[in-house]
C-alpha cells in the first residue's frame, strides 16, 4: 500500500481520450491529432506511474526500451516519441496508450522464455498504436486485475460504492477492450516488426503457449490479464505461426538467420521480483502486515482481502460490507482533525457520531456517518489513526439495514491497527527469479528436488521455463527457479 492519486482522476483522464477533435483540413487534422494523442499519452503515463509504479530496475527498463525502440523505428509511425515501461506488477499483462506509450509488467517479463518472445509481445502493443486502434475501437470499460479484486467480484452494493460516492473506495485501471480483429491485426503487425529487426517471428507463438499453460493452471478467476482480455489462445497460436511463415518467406529467411536470445533474456530476468512484493504488505492468517510502513491490522475472519498499491480492501463473505485501509490524502501541514472535517464536508456526509477513539496507544479519530451514492444511502464507519507521521484512513461500509450486523466487526478490525514489531515480518523480502545452472543431465523435476527452498510449485517452475517436469536438462544449461518470499503458514 502506497499513497497515490485517486482512481477517479484516472477515469476522468482516460475518458478524455475518447473526446473527438475538430479540425479544418486533412493535414491540420492529422498534425493536431498526433499532437493531441501524444499529450494524452503523456498525461496518462503520469497516472499509470502513480497508480501502479514502474519497476525499479534501470537495466531491465533499458533492455525493454531498446527492444521496443528498434521495432518502433521500423513501424509505420517511427517519429512518435515512443516510451516503453516495466510496471511493478506480478500480473502477466501488457498494454499500450495513445502516443506511443507501451507497458509490460515484471510478471510478463519473468514468464517470457527468450528475447524473441518478449519482442513479439512488445511488437503487438506497438501494433495497437500504429494501427490507431484506440481511436477506432468500440470503447468498453473493464477493470484490469493488477493486484485488486476485479469489478466482477463485487456485489452490486460494493460496485455502486466503487463507481460513485466515496473517494478512493477502490482503485484500478479502466482499459478499453479491443475487438478480435484489432487484436489479430496487432499480432500480425508485431510479428512483422519483430522479423524486420532480426527476431525469430515464431517467438510470440511460444509466449501464447505459456499463457495457455497459465490459463490451464489457474481457475477462471485468476486468468492472466493478457489471456482474459484477448482472443482465444489456440486461434492466435495457429495464426501467429502462419504469419511467421509468411514473414520468413517475405524476407527469404531461415530460422538460423534470426535471433532468439534466451541467454540474453535470462541475464536480465535474473533477480526480478516474482509474485506479490511482501514489502508492500502481505497476509498472515487474518492479519495484514506491512513491513515498510511498520504496521499491522487484523481483518475479520473469512473476509476476502486484496492489497493494492494505494489501498487494502476487504469484503465480507456475503458481499454486504466493505473495509478499506489507505493513507489519507492530507494537504501539507493539515492536522488530522482538520482533514477529517474537510473530508466529511466534501462528502456531504450526514454525521451521527464522532470523537476520539481508543486504538492502543495511538491517537485516533472516529466518525459514524451516512452518504448518498447511486441513489442509495450507505452507512460508514470512518477511523483515522495518526501513526509514524502518516494519517491512516479506515472506512467500513454497509447498507443501513445491515449496519448492526457489521458495525461491531468493522470497528474491532479498525481498532486492531498497531505497530508491527515482529522482526521476522519486518525483515521479509520478496521472492525472486534465480537463473540457476544445472550440474548434470537430469529431468526438470530432479533439478527442483535439489533445491527444497524453491518457493513456488513445480508446475510454476515448469511454466516459467516452457518445459514439462519430465523434460531433460543438459549439464551446464540454466533454468529459472524462484526463491524467497514470506514464510506463510
What are these regions (language model features)?
Residues 8-11, 18-290, 296-299, 309-311, ...:
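A Zn2+-metalloprotease active-site environment signal
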Residues 425-455:
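Primarily a LysM-type cell-wall glycan-binding module
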Residues 296, 302-304, 472, 478:
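Residue-level marker of beta-strand positions
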Amino acid at each position: 500500500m502506497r499513497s497515490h492519486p485517486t482512481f477517479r482522476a484516472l477515469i476522468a483522464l482516460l475518458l478524455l481520450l475518447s473526446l473527438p477533435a475538430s479540425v479544418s483540413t486533412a493535414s491540420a487534422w492529422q498534425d493536431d491529432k498526433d499532437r493531441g494523442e501524444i499529450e494524452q499519452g503523456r498525461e496518462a503515463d503520469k497516472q499509470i506511474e502513480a497508480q501502479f509504479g514502474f519497476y525499479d530496475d534501470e537495466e531491465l527498463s533499458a533492455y525493454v526500451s531498446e527492444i521496443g525502440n528498434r521495432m518502433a523505428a521500423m513501424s509505420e509511425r517511427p517519429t512518435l516519441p515512443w516510451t516503453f515501461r516495466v510496471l511493478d506488477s506480478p500480473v502477466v499483462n501488457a498494454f499500450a496508450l495513445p502516443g506511443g506509450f507501451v507497458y509490460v509488467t515484471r510478471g510478463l517479463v519473468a514468464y517470457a522464455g527468450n528475447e524473441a518472445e518478449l519482442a513479439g509481445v512488445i511488437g503487438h502493443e506497438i501494433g495497437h498504436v500504429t494501427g490507431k486502434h484506440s481511436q477506432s475501437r468500440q470503447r468498453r470499460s473493464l477493470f484490469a486485475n493488477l493486484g485488486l479484486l476485479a469489478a466482477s467480484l463485487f456485489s452490486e452494493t460494493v460496485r455502486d460504492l466503487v463507481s460513485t460516492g466515496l473517494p478512493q473506495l477502490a482503485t484500478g485501471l479502466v482499459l478499453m477492450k479491443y475487438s478480435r480483429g484489432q487484436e489479430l491485426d496487432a499480432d500480425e503487425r508485431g510479428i512483422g516488426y519483430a522479423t524486420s529487426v532480426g527476431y525469430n517471428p515464431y517467438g510470440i507463438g511460444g509466449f501464447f503457449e505459456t499463457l495457455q499453460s497459465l490459463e490451464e493452471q489457474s481457475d477462471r478467476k485468476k486468468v492472466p490479464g493478457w489471456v482474459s482480455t484477448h482472443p482465444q489462445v489456440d486461434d492466435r497460436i495457429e495464426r501467429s505461426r502462419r504469419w511467421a511463415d509468411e514473414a520468413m518467406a517475405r524476407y527469404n529467411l531461415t530460422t538460423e538467420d534470426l535471433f532468439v536470445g534466451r541467454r540474453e533474456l535470462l541475464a536480465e530476468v535474473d533477480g526480478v521480483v516474482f509474485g506479490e512484493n511482501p514489502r508492500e504488505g502481505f497476509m498472515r492468517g487474518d492479519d495484514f502486515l506491512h513491513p515498510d510502513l511498520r504496521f499491522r491490522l487484523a481483518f475479520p475472519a473469512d473476509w476476502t482481502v486484496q492489497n493494492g498499491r494505494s489501498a487494502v480492501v476487504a469484503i465480507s463473505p456475503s458481499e454486504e460490507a466493505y473495509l478499506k485501509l489507505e493513507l489519507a490524502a492530507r494537504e501539507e501541514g493539515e492536522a488530522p482533525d482538520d482533514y477529517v472535517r474537510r473530508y466529511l464536508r466534501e462528502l456531504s456526509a450526514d454525521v451521527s457520531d464522532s470523537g476520539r477513539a481508543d486504538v492502543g496507544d495511538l491517537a485516533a479519530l472516529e466518525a459514524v456517518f451516512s452518504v448518498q451514492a447511486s441513489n442509495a444511502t450507505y452507512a460508514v464507519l470512518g477511523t483515522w489513526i495518526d501513526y509514524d507521521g502518516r494519517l491512516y484512513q479506515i472506512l467500513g461500509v454497509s447498507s443501513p439495514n445491515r449496519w448492526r450486523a457489521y458495525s461491531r466487526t468493522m470497528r474491532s478490525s479498525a481498532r486492531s491497527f498497531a505497530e508491527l514489531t515482529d522482526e521476522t515480518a519486518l525483515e521479509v523480502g520478496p521472492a525472486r527469479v534465480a537463473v540457476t545452472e544445472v550440474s548434470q543431465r537430469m529431468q526438470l523435476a530432479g533439478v527442483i528436488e535439489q533445491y527444497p527452498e524453491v518457493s513456488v510449485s513445480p508446475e510454476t517452475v515448469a511454466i516459467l521455463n516452457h518445459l514439462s517436469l519430465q523434460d531433460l536438462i543438459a549439464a551446464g544449461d540454466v533454468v529459472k527457479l524462484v526463491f524467497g518470499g514470506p514464510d506463510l503458514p
